[in-house]
Amino acid sequence: MKRKSVMLLAILLIAGALVSAITYQTMQNPDNGNWKGYEKEWAIVDSLEGQGLPASALKAAEAIYVYAKTDKNDEQIVKAIIHKAKYTSMVEENEQIKAIHLFQEEIETSSGVIKSVLQSMTAEIYWNYYTNNRWRFNNRSKTVDFKNEDISTWDVTTLHQKTYDLYVASIANREELKKVKTTRYNEILLKGDEYGQMLRPTMYDFLAHRALDFLMNDEVYITDPAYAFNIDNPVVFGSNKAFAGFVFSAEEVESKKLLALRIFQDLTLAHLYDPYPAALIDVDIKRLNFAKNNTIINNKDSLYLNALIAEEKLYANDSSSTRISFLSLSCPLLQVVVELKR
């Protein structure tokens, strides 16, 4: 089976070759005639990190950030912010809280694609803070000592809601994001192979899938009310065309699960008529797994298996169908049927 390879947001970017002979002195002022271009200046940053000088690397990254701001280079701005957060975590305590403050400040002054990327990254940092400090929240209710600027005083509901809100905000500008190719941001995305790029061709694909990855985590729903939306319509196991065209009632209770389904619909519509179905198949597989794990329909296992079999037949001539075959063959219900026929 062809290994799935997608581009992942680089919170800690991979360091390049070290240039040990270069020092921070040439970086102090990008306008003093010493500016060497982004590639060489980042080599200086990498060199300083390699020499175990995170404080100097931080200052060097800050210099690039200032230059990128003047240059209005969104890609380099985000890359510099990522490195600033990285080196801040090396030289200061409470690194996640510091990183959150850094990203929040940037969100307030940013716009367009760069703002969406920062919102998605900040959401991930919030969620990582929760998972790393889950034990702190186990018995904590809403506290009278709550401070909006101090995440360590938050309760689990507040933290979950903040994470959710940021992921939602990151894809709010979906039409603009759909127009921007992920290849434009190769400096801040870990580049996958050609197949991986087919799965995430636009920044909307990239950010929407990140939001879905969050919404597919069962732990996200522990603070939801008992009257939350339930997935009880078999259309979630239907063909991509049937699912994409289904209209969920406006009277449905707004919930995280309903939002997830609507994101799946939007991604499906975006790729329904692609010349190559790799991105569509990827969305279909993800949607079917989400449906199987979240629906209250009694015969969900058979609906899931039948959906996989239908999908496999539909895309039998495409290499991506091997992923569907693997899932259907590993389906417990199919294994039971095989045993009964023996």
For each predicted feature, which ranges?
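Bacterial Sec-dependent N-terminal signal peptides
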Residues: 1-38
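Extracytoplasmic/secretory-pathway proteins
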Residues: 34-342
